Structures are given as C-alpha cells and as structure tokens.
C-alpha cells in the first residue's frame, strides 16, 4: 500500500502541474507500448506452422509498410535472404504473401480463376479512373471479351501504319518543343517522354481526332486522372480529397470527349478512314450475347487503353534515354547500327515496320531496360480459396493477398550474371549472360486469343497468364521507333559529371525515375 500511495501522490502532483496533457500522453504511450509488446509476443509465441513465415515487425497494422514502400526490391531480397522465396508481411494491416522466383511467378500469375482474383485488388483504384463496366469493374469473362476486341485491332497491317505515325509525331515534337530549341541544352527527360508517349499512342491507337484534342488542357485532364493512381486510393478511393475530386471531374470530361468523337464518327460513317485504330474496332464489336458495345463503355475503354499503357511506356522510354545519356558509347553504337542498315546518306529514309526487327541492338537496349526497370514491381492477387503451395507444407488462407514480382527474378544473379549492371550486349546471341530464358512458351486461349501462359522464364516484362499485357507488340514497336528517331537527332550525356542514372521513385504504383531526371543533349 505504501508504494501505491507514493505512486498515487506522484500521479496527482504531475496531473495538477501539467494537467490533462500529461495524462493523455501517458495513457497513449502506455497503449502503444502494450500494443507493441503484444504484437512481438504474438509473433514469437503463436507462429502458424502451415503458413509462410511472417516478416518480423514491431508495430501492428503498420508492419513492414515503410520498408516495403521505400524500396520494394531491397525489401524482397532482404526478406528472401532471411525467410526464403515465400514469406508474409504486414501492409497497412493486411497479410501479404510474397512468392518469389520462377515457381512463385507461375503459382500466382497462372493461378486458377477460382483461386486468385485481380479484380478485387484493383477495382477500387481503377474504376474511378477508367469508368464503370470495363476492366476490373466487370466479370472476368467480360474483361476477356474486351481484351479480345482491342487485340483484334492490333494487326500487322495496323502496325505498318503505326510506325509512320509515331515517327512523324516524335519529329514534330522535337521541332516544336521549347526544350529542344538551339543546338544543345538540358532537358527533364521524364516530362518529355511522358508527352511523346501519350501523343504517339493516342494518334496511332485512337485516331487523329483524339490526338487533336491533346492540347495542354486535355493533357492536364489526363494528369488529374493519373493522380488517381496514388497508393492511398486502394483504401480511400471514395474520400473527398483534392486529387480525387480532380480525378472525378477529369474522368467525366474525358469520357464525354470520347463519346462526342464516337457519335461524330457514327454520323459521318468514317469507318474507312479510321479502320486501323482501336476505337473503330470497338464501335463495330458485339459481345457474345449479341449486345453491341455501348458508346459509354467504348469511352471508358479508351481511357483505360491510354492510362494502362502510358505509365509503362513513359517510364520505360525515360529509362532508355537516361541510360543512353549515362552510356554515350551505346548511343553511338545505335547510330552506327542505323548507318549499317540504312546507309550514310542523309536524311535517313523513313522507318518502316520491317526495319524494326533489323535494329537488333535497339531491341536489346529495350530488353535490358525492361529487365532492370520493370514498370510494375508488385503484381497482386486476392486469394479466393485456400491454396496449397506445391512442395511445401504451406497453405495460403483466403485472408491473404498474394504478390508476384517478376522484376526480382530478372535481377537474380542465377539467371543474369552481374545482374545490376546495365549491359545491352548481354542479350547478344552467344554472350552467355542470359541463363534459363529458353523455356518452352506454352499458350492458352483465355478468351481473347492464344496468350503466353509461360511464367517459367526469368524475364517477364509483360507478365504471364490471363492478365498478360495484350499491348506487348505495340509497346515494342512504339518504344523502338521512338528510340531510333531520338538517336537520329541527338547525342545525350549526363550533366555535372554524374555517373549512372537517377534512383527509382517507388512512391507511386509504377517504378518511375526520380524527378527531376535531367540530361544534356546535343543535336547531330
């Protein structure tokens, strides 16, 4: 009792002196301390032997969120060294199971539809941006039909016209861009490539009318849509936050613009003029039940088409230019490759679709950039049924989210010796610097044509399985054409004697160069 009386007197004195601030602070600190203690004890004393090991963390709910968010790849490799290829971490209160390596990629990316689900993970993020009844806001069977409609338009005949459109857009941009006036200067290359990729994609895939709308105001609307892809919107997509209000206004405005273009096309019957673009393909498409694709859904798919491809192409093209600035010798090799193929007479002849496959070093530069800078570092799926992990004792419960990270595999020394070195020549035939990339590429029709199911390759920049990117061929065409055109015009270099490239910004869902990504340029 004596000790209790002393403590009571001390508490009374402190409360009198500092008031309720001291009391509230003491209680809050005690609660936090208790929560941390119970969280640590639960990890040490109540391990579940039939679930993957949980990454140790001090704070409940927060878990490993901060270390994962700062650098996902470092987090994955550190955890793999300690726990193995499969482990679970706490991400804002959710249990997230990561399964790395070839087996992990196959387990998740080729998981059965009844076992894993992408829609429940991404719909809160994508539906406010794209619009209703498309992509992840519809049954998977309908999504497969939508992908088939768009894939049908990506024909070889269309690709021939796309190369000319893209080259002309890049040349027009270079000639008109304030940042490229004069004979030399510096430029924020990420900003430039974001504009070039959206101009080229909108013109090639969606037609001249759409491209004509991409003035500064329309580009600003797409920027507002882009801001809707912030990670916080996985949970707070509904919140009346400033960027969400701007997102919703932009979505309505852009969708209305597309619907006006669609209506004008129907009235003018401009099918022949626009036969190569995806908008026209959707306008004449019909679902399996006989329902024509509604104009509203076409408009929403047009938004999805640009937004989904824009991040990947913008990021990848920026990394290409940054690496060429860091390695001017490789940029000169690219120029020499074009001299060998097209001759030394200037100006070079216009690029043709058939030329792209001859530009082998250009292709290898793209491959090496995608290997080191996969646009998406974490591919997520919701577990719908308990999943047994083959060859282990583990069963993944339905309360977990799964993550596959093909980008980890492409940075694994097992398959790519000296994996963090940027070396386009590792892809040269016979170099011996790419291992395990000769797996048989199995194909399956998920409802939108034969698609690669193979996840056994260590190099999967476009994913695998039913959600594999349908735009791989177009993205390759677009990026190689942009690269070849830029090489014809410029020499790039790092500024201020810097070595290598800028670090990666992981604060968004896509692995972008950390801003500002400045490089020096000089016209040839």
Swiss-Prot record:
Question: Which reaction does this enzyme catalyse, per its entry?
Answer: a 14alpha-methyl steroid + 3 reduced [NADPH--hemoprotein reductase] + 3 O2 = a Delta(14) steroid + formate + 3 oxidized [NADPH--hemoprotein reductase] + 4 H2O + 4 H(+); a 14alpha-methyl steroid + reduced [NADPH--hemoprotein reductase] + O2 = a 14alpha-hydroxymethyl steroid + oxidized [NADPH--hemoprotein reductase] + H2O + H(+); a 14alpha-hydroxymethyl steroid + reduced [NADPH--hemoprotein reductase] + O2 = a 14alpha-formyl steroid + oxidized [NADPH--hemoprotein reductase] + 2 H2O + H(+); a 14alpha-formyl steroid + reduced [NADPH--hemoprotein reductase] + O2 = a Delta(14) steroid + formate + oxidized [NADPH--hemoprotein reductase] + H2O + 2 H(+)
In the UniProt record, the gene name given for this protein reads CYP51
For this UniProt entry, what is the primary localization, expressed as one broad class? membrane
Q: What does this protein do?
A: Sterol 14alpha-demethylase that plays a critical role in the third module of ergosterol biosynthesis pathway, being ergosterol the major sterol component in fungal membranes that participates in a variety of functions. The third module or late pathway involves the ergosterol synthesis itself through consecutive reactions that mainly occur in the endoplasmic reticulum (ER) membrane. In filamentous fungi, during the initial step of this module, lanosterol (lanosta-8,24-dien-3beta-ol) can be metabolized to eburicol.
Q: Which GO terms describe its biological process?
A: sterol biosynthetic process
- In this chain, heme is annotated as bound at 469
Q: Which family does it belong to?
A: Belongs to the cytochrome P450 family.
Keywords for this entry? Answer: Heme, Iron, Lipid biosynthesis, Lipid metabolism, Membrane, Metal-binding, Monooxygenase, Oxidoreductase, Steroid biosynthesis, Steroid metabolism, Sterol biosynthesis, Sterol metabolism
What's one GO MF term for it? heme binding
One cellular component term (GO) for this entry is: membrane
Q: What is this protein called?
A: Eburicol 14-alpha-demethylase
InterPro entries given in the database record: CYP450_sterol_14alpha_dmase, Cyt_P450, Cyt_P450_CS, Cyt_P450_E_grp-IV, Cyt_P450_sf
Q: What is the E.C. number?
A: 1.14.14.154
Show the Pfam families listed in the entry: p450
Record lineage: Eukaryota, Fungi, Dikarya, Ascomycota, Pezizomycotina
